[in-house]
Amino acid sequence: MKKLFIITGEYSGDRHAADVVRELKKINPELEIEAVGGACLANEGVKLYCDHSKMSAIGFNWKIILSHIFLGRTIANYLKNEFKPDMVLLVDYGGFNLNLSKVISKFGFKIYYYIPPQIWASRKWRINTVKKCINKVLTIFPFEKEMYEKEGIDVEFVGHPLLAQIPEKPDKNTVFEENGLDKDKKLVSIFPGSRVFEIKNLLTLFLDSARVIKEKEPNVQFALAQAPTIKDELIKPIIEEYSDLDIKVLKNRNYELLASSDALILASGTVALEAALYETPMIISYKGPAYLYMVYMLVRCIKRVCLPNIIMDEDIVPELLQKNATIDKVSSNILYILNNESYRNSMVNSLKNVKQKLMTSGAAQKTAKIISDNI
């Protein structure tokens, strides 16, 4: 019986890996699978060696670093001495997974990387580790394939998993009715992020901007997408200070808001790509710790951070970062989207091109077949 071990580090990787497992079981039901993962993989019947919930941290913190080193050694020992897989599938989470690959590549089993590190964005030298330690790379962006091929790395573009995961666009009137929104008003939805430090750094900025937007455009309403990782006690006191805006705080309604809003205020991340797939106009605004931004500026390889802009290699979506993340700039850019039809239509058309460029069906199916054929 063949054995596969999967390693993810946060929710998105867990979700993408679970989709692959679901397809693998159709092709190769006898395959024995264990993982470092979360609820999504567990729900597919995968035995978890450990839960990854404590791994998804950002920042330079010795406690985090030491815990990752210890966990990496523990996983490596388990793979070498106990589970002995035929293949290890690394999924996203480059900082941890690439370092682990340096150790486990010496053990003789195949190592495939699904959703590899974004070396085109920063720390391009990491491609040397990929070249040395990874047997095959499965990319989700078309431009990555050419980049890896130039380095002589075995690579295949499988498509972006979001294309299969994202629901069809819902009926806007139904969304408004079910969530207590006014059909006669424009909707601006706020996505302040899924991490505590993002809420602390961004939410007040976004709400102050919303207040300015409301003053200049009274026929606007606001909704806030609360991530499942953010507790009510963090959000509620902040929202209460903006009671004049009558903001609808919604949980588990991300796709409905992304699809039905007239404009979006987003923290940078995958949510921007999800919004692009719904062709919804947006701005990106992000402000993090100054020292982390300085480090990022030193190691970055590209000038853009928003995925739709990176994919098309042009400035489609406004990026308001660090010193440009101001109330004036956030509010004025949203007002321009709401009130300038020509600009709005231009952005919508550009977002359609993003969707077209990623269009290839069945990332999970393709990944599963490649694994099954090569394990």
Give the location of each predicted region:
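Nucleotide-activated sugar donor-binding and catalytic core shared by glycosyltransferases
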Residues: 1-375
